Amino acid sequence: MFNPVTPQARPYAEHCCPRPLHGASAGTPGLQGLDFPVCHQPNLASSHHGYGLVPGTEHPGGAADGSRFSTPRGAGKLGKKRALSISPLSDSSVDLQTVIRTSPNSLVAFINSRCASAGGSYGHLSISTISPSLGYQNPPGQQKGQGQLFSHTPPLPPCSSHETLSSRPGLLHPTPARGTIKHCQQLKLERSLSSPLTAKYPEEKSEGDISSPASTGTQDPLLGMLSVRDDLEKEDGKPESETIYETNCYWDGCAKEFDTQEQLVHHINNEHIHGEKKEFVCHWAACSREQRPFKAQYMLVVHMRRHTGEKPHKCTFEGCNKAYSRLENLKTHLRSHTGEKPYVCEHEGCNKAFSNASDRAKHQNRTHSNEKPYICKIPGCTKRYTDPSSLRKHVKTVHGPDAHVTKKHRGSVVPGHALPASAAPQDMKQEKNTNGPAEIRKDDGKLLVPDLVSKPQPSPGGQSSCSSDRSPLGSTTNNDSGVEMTGNTGGSYEDLVHAGGCGARGSHGHLGADGLQKLENLRIDKLKQMRKPSTKGLNLPAIPEPVCRRCVRVCV
């Protein structure tokens, strides 16, 4: 099936193992023209030596003439070519076991040699690439030990071999030493903490590189296999809302209990949501929306999942148990499996891409801008953030989970705005009862009349008491001025006209606050009598609004 070893490849084969028996398979013809890099020779030699290569079979001499392989050198030459080794050994004493333990790339080369096919992978030198006869299959004890070494990677299929260990009993030892495995585990942990490659990789993943390592042919395949897993672990680390599994209905006026969550959801959708066709309001007990209506029915259906804990949108990938209440959240999660990153940074010259828009916004605000437009509006807090999610997290953790709700729906009156009509009379009456008449005198002639609470009366000496203010005829509550009135004030219409005339030509010294108060009481009482329907069938003409008080007096 295979041709004998060619003269070009024979020195390398003699270096790696004893001369093969007659009929043994050798290297493929396609490898005769390959030139392997020198940096992988120590790794390959160390991997052979660590698995029981007989030291006596090594040839310290050079390669044969015409060989195109970069064959291993002697002790002196090997020390010069060992560019990637960090071993402090001298040229005269080279220990391959030390090379295995101290070489920064020995573990990576071993992984590549296991997962490489017969045609080679990514330009790395593997055992099965050089000669299929040298390919070997690890016994179960070795596979288990190697799985412990590289437990962070998914299980890899074993490489195909053309020759079992039983055909070469003196070539490989059955199992490696346990001390070597433990030492390699320690090296792996130290390298993960100190190696720039390992430290740089999570940073690049968090920034969202547009090209995943799995699709790039120049990167290590081990990193490509870890890329998708890192995305999943990154998503798993995100804080999620508490898992709710509700089976009782707390709708207003309903206290039914069910066995499963599905029955509760079916009950709410059919009896509570679809039963109300005109308004879409959540009547769940202690709901933070405080019965504010939704614009559409489907919004109420999605909102109710916050109370019931329903998550109908489940991940379809095998082995993933993620589920979401909103469809857009599921779509974002699926991108962690597929590697899709449709949101590209809008900054010129930046090729970063992200799986969701919020991560892109965070990147643009943090990397390309120093602006922090999202400000905490809690009184006394001056925190500013680049993205809304960080602001929400700050409000929830520092000011409490209900801080944004209480601030958004608080019922305090904004300064500068008038009080509602229903609350104005009581507040004004209380102020009158507590402060007394002296409080009215402090206002320098300012009266609180209906619909004119915030407008002071003009000075009696400089202007007539009649003004172009809106007439109180359209108001049904005529006692909102804050002054207690009786049914009969004891005055007549002639007194009203006389008082009005006096008010026009009198001075502040003659009338004072009591005179102005009496004038307003008489005017309001007379206007109330005018609004009553006449028993004699007299129909008064309708007065358009707004109308001047002078016109009211003249027309009557």
Curated annotation (Swiss-Prot):
A biological process term (GO) from this entry: positive regulation of DNA-templated transcription
* Location in or out of the cell: Cytoplasm; Nucleus
Signal peptide (from-to): none
Gene3D superfamilies named among the record's database cross-references: Classic Zinc Finger (3.30.160.60)
What are the boundaries of the region Interaction with DNA?
A: 295-303, 357-362, 387-393
Give the boundaries of each C2H2-type zinc finger.
247-272, 280-307, 313-337, 343-368, 374-399
For bias kind Low complexity, which ranges apply?
135-148, 454-472
Domain of life of the native organism: Eukaryota
Region named Disordered: 57-83, 133-178, 200-222, 387-492
Q: Which GO terms describe its molecular function?
A: chromatin binding; DNA-binding transcription factor activity, RNA polymerase II-specific; RNA polymerase II cis-regulatory region sequence-specific DNA binding; sequence-specific DNA binding; zinc ion binding
Q: Which UniProt keywords apply?
A: Activator, Cytoplasm, Developmental protein, Differentiation, DNA-binding, Metal-binding, Nucleus, Proto-oncogene, Repeat, Transcription, Transcription regulation, Zinc, Zinc-finger
Q: Pfam families this protein is in?
A: zf-C2H2 (PF00096), zf-C2H2_15 (PF23561)
Q: Which InterPro entries match?
A: GLI-like, Znf-C2H2_ZIC1-5/GLI1-3-like, Znf_C2H2_sf, Znf_C2H2_type
The entry's cellular-component GO terms read: cytoplasm; nucleus
Q: Which SUPFAM superfamilies match?
A: beta-beta-alpha zinc fingers
Sum up the protein's function in the record's words.
Acts as a transcriptional activator. Binds to the DNA consensus sequence 5'-GACCACCCA-3'. May regulate the transcription of specific genes during normal development. May play a role in craniofacial development and digital development, as well as development of the central nervous system and gastrointestinal tract. Mediates SHH signaling. Plays a role in cell proliferation and differentiation via its role in SHH signaling.
Q: Which family does it belong to?
A: Belongs to the GLI C2H2-type zinc-finger protein family.
Full protein name? Zinc finger protein GLI1
> Mind giving the lineage of the organism this protein is from?
Eukaryota, Metazoa, Chordata, Craniata, Vertebrata
